[in-house]
């Protein structure tokens, strides 16, 4: 019996007539009162989320179905009047008050993101350490309309345009929260985001037009389970038992992260595979290891932070970070090598400025101890690096040095990119 309840039922709380007298108490939140979710709380919460219908231990397969509220079209009409963004999945529109609706061209893409969003939401319901605060919530879904409803934010970090001295503190604080969110996704939800970039980081509203609000991670359209999960085969079925979708976990390096924000370890793998003319079959690949997934997500987050640093410093837009756009076809090994050049040069500049020792396994002088870069390709890489260094000198980057003196910024960059290395096995290679 709960200690407080026992006290209420003790003889000292009885009236002289022998009747039970319970003193009224001010209302208290369940979380604050009990410290965690109760069984009844779980029942009232769970009926709105994915339900397990069967577990096949022989094949290690988990079968789930959608709750009824996701299959009913009982939301406000979707007008598609105010377009907020568009992508390969479909489009995002403003919806009702302070909400957005993400409309999918394909229902299978909706099923994927909806399943991942719901898994995260279930994880957030039992979170106690606050690491989940920088993960976007979803409000509801409608499979009939191919729609996912979410809170409204000002814009993505990629579209944010008010960079000034006052942006430094919220940028650092925001990325510290995003780092916690990546750990929460990996360790509490068993998920690999695999597509962290400024376009998938949302900026919240503030009281002023020029203030940077909190940063929130979104877009789980390519998220997958990592190998630390007990079951990796998760299938969504209809109420009549028809299979609607199978949540994949097989990943190969070309499909992980946007090419512009691929960590150096992934760029090196893609460079090697393209040079050998080898294209991996995704169905023959396994799930990404939990630690590898964590490292890759943190590294992509680190290069997204460098994007913010560049916008704080390069008001002339002379430095093409992260995309040099050299016009190579994706089948050319140089296509992947080109994205390494701005990362290497920028990190060398920051290492010198902050007195850090960031060994990335590739230098602007042409040192590549773990990857055999051909002489022709290295010559091209060195030319890119020389051009980038010239652009740094022509920009206002070095005039903005005071903006980089935030006490936590150097350590945060070093922590996020600590394990990245231009080699097929990363830092451990």
Swiss-Prot record:
GO terms for molecular function: ATP binding; protein serine kinase activity; protein serine/threonine kinase activity. The active site is at 195 (proton acceptor). The keyword Magnesium does not apply. Residues 36-40, 344-350 are annotated as: SUMO interaction motif. Residues 1-409 form the Protein kinase domain. InterPro entries: Kinase-like_dom_sf, Prot_kinase_dom, Tyr_kinase_AS. Residues 14-23 have a biased composition (Low complexity). Plays many key roles by phosphorylating several proteins including the viral DNA processivity factor BMRF1, EBNA1 or EBNA2. Modifies the host nuclear envelope structure and induces the redistribution of nuclear envelope-associated proteins by phosphorylating host nucleoporins. Subsequently, promotes the nuclear transport of EBV lytic proteins. Required for efficient lytic DNA replication and release of nucleocapsids from the nucleus. This is Serine/threonine-protein kinase BGLF4. It comes from Epstein-Barr virus (strain B95-8) (HHV-4). The lineage of its organism: Viruses, Duplodnaviria, Heunggongvirae, Peploviricota, Herviviricetes.
């Amino acid at each position: 019996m709960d200690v407080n309840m026992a006290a209420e039922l003790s003889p000292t709380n009885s009236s002289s007539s022998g009747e039970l007298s319970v003193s009224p108490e001010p209302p208290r939140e369940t979380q604050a009162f009990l410290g965690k979710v109760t069984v009844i709380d779980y029942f009232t919460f769970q009926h709105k989320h994915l339900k397990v219908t069967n577990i096949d231990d022989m094949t290690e397969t988990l079968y789930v179905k959608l709750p009824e509220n996701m299959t009913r079209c009982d939301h406000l009409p979707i007008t598609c009047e105010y377009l907020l963004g568009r992508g390969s999945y479909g489009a995002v529109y403003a919806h009702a008050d302070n909400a957005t609706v993400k409309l999918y061209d394909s229902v299978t893409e909706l099923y994927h993101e909806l399943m991942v969003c719901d898994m995260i939401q279930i994880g957030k319901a039992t979170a106690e350490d606050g690491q989940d605060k920088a993960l976007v919530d979803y409000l509801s879904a409608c499979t009939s309309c191919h729609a996912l409803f979410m809170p409204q934010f000002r814009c993505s970090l990629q579209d944010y345009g008010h960079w000034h001295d006052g942006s430094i503190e919220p940028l650092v604080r925001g990325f510290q929260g995003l780092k916690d969110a990546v750990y929460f996704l990996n360790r509490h939800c068993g998920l690999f985001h695999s597509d962290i970039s400024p376009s998938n980081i949302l900026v919240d509203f503030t009281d002023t037009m020029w203030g940077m609000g909190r940063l929130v991670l979104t877009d789980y359209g390519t998220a997958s389970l990592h190998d630390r999960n007990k079951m990796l085969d998760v299938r969504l079925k209809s109420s009549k038992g028809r299979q609607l979708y199978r949540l994949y976990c097989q990943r190969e390096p070309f499909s992980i992260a946007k090419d512009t924000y691929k960590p150096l370890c992934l760029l090196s793998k893609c460079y090697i595979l393209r040079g050998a003319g080898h294209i991996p079959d995704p169905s023959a690949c396994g799930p990404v290891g939990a630690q590898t997934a964590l490292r890759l997500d943190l590294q992509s987050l680190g290069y997204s932070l460098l994007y913010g640093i560049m916008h704080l410093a390069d008001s002339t837009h002379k430095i093409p970070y992260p995309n040099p756009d050299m016009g190579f076809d994706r089948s050319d090994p140089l296509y992947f090598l080109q994205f390494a050049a701005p990362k290497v040069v920028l990190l060398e500049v920051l290492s010198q400025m902050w007195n850090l020792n960031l060994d990335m396994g590739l230098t602007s002088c042409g040192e590549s101890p773990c990857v055999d870069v051909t002489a022709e390709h290295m010559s091209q890489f060195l030319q890119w690096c020389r051009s980038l260094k010239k652009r740094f000198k022509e920009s206002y980057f070095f005039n903005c040095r005071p903006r980089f003196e935030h006490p936590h910024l150097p350590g945060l960059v070093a922590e996020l990119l600590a394990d990245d290395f231009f080699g097929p096995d990363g830092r451990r290679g």
